[in-house]
Amino acid sequence: SKAEIRKNPAYLFASIHYLLDTTRGKKITVMLPYSYRLKDVSDWFRQLWAESLGKKVDVDGNHVHLGQTPVNALGATDQHSQIQLYVEGPFDKLVCFLETEKFNADVTIPEGFEDHPGISYLSGHTMANLLMTEKSGTEHALVINHRPNMTIRLPEVNANSVGQLLYMLEVSTAFAGGLYRVNAFDQPGVEFGKQYAYAVMGKQGFEKKKAEFEQTKLPPRKVL
């Protein structure tokens, strides 16, 4: 809610995404929470960013066909499925970490397995410490390989902090719409498909759409 735009987190989030997309070719944005309780935030953000900013025309009516592709992931699970691509693959991604300073529950890794140095070094550490160390390692690997990334840190995961995060991301999406010069508050592409579905199912008032649908010649499809 800061008035000074350079200190406004919502505007900073939007401008970082916009500039890296339009000047550095970062066409994919990855949201990577290192807390299972924040997993649904990345799922929700994927929907928010995609349908708000993926547009064919801008506010002046120009055909622009723009929008970043949002990808959701989960740390540390996806270190073993996606991170290889982000660290060494195409230079087309921006990674946004989500982390929390405090976990509601934590477990200390017990002593044991002294004869197995590959795991015994973990004794005495907490699971939270292990998870956040994994995050730091991933972050470092991205930086060393010149992959842009950012971190949003919550004090803890509760209704207050998550509510603020969701609101910030919503405002940021509106800011991004202004930067891209598109309407971030409609989804004409979604409505286009819905209208054909209504027509085919016989909803009243969509007779013209049904005729249009039936007259459309689609290329033959092969079943593999």
Where are these regions (language model features)?
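Active-site phosphate/pyrophosphate-binding segments
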Residues: 1-96, 101-104, 189-224
